[in-house]
């Protein structure tokens, strides 16, 4: 028999807890980068957040916790420079692909999370969300395959 994990987005300073959580075998907590806050992710700030919010949730549930990390390689969310804002987030928009890709901010997000999580043995696992194994990409997507952030997982 397999395990049933419940997924829950982590978007605030607390994680909801419901009575049906007792039926789950563990939790898959979803972390998304905030492109408006790029450069603010450090192992210390992430570690403090994980210790205060995620560890409290872990203690209350006493079940395995897995973290799903998602960080697109956007440079900014500013769409004012585009005449076609309705299609700005499109792999076919060549102008968007060429000026709004920031592989470094994606890598910094993963560095901060991996460094913070590596010393916390109560975290059962880490996953990179949005991974696209069919092709190495250097675009704005969340996939780390073919990008500098991919190498971080090989060095752990």
Predicted regions span which residues?
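Alpha-helix-loop-beta-strand connector modules within alpha/beta enzyme cores
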Residues: 56-57
């Amino acid at each position: 028999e397999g395990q049933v994990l419940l997924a829950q987005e982590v978007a605030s300073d607390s994680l909801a807890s419901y009575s049906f959580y007792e039926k789950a075998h563990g939790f898959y907590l979803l972390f998304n980068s905030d492109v408006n806050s790029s450069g603010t992710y450090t192992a210390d700030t992430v570690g403090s957040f994980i210790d205060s919010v995620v560890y409290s949730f872990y203690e209350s549930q006493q079940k395995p916790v897995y973290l799903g990390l998602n960080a697109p390689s956007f440079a900014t969310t500013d769409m004012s420079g585009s005449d076609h804002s309705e299609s700005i987030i499109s792999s076919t928009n060549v102008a968007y692909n060429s000026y709004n890709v920031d592989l470094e901010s994606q890598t910094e997000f993963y560095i901060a999370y991996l460094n913070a999580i590596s010393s916390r043995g109560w975290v059962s696992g880490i996953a990179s969300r949005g991974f696209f194994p069919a092709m190495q990409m250097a675009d704005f997507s969340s996939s780390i395959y073919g990008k500098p952030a991919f190498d971080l997982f090989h060095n752990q």
